[in-house]
Amino acid sequence: QGGGPQWAVGHFM
């Protein structure tokens, strides 16, 4: 990816 913590938030939450 590459755009910020947005994708990470979706994965962790």
Swiss-Prot record:
GO terms for biological process: defense response; neuropeptide signaling pathway. It is found in: Secreted. The modification Methionine amide is found at M13. Belongs to the bombesin/neuromedin-B/ranatensin family. Expressed by the skin glands. PROSITE patterns: BOMBESIN. The modification Pyrrolidone carboxylic acid is found at Q1. It comes from the Eukaryota. It holds the Pfam family Bombesin. Keywords: Amidation, Amphibian defense peptide, Pyrrolidone carboxylic acid, Secreted. This is Bombesin-like peptide L. One of its GO terms (cellular component) is extracellular region.
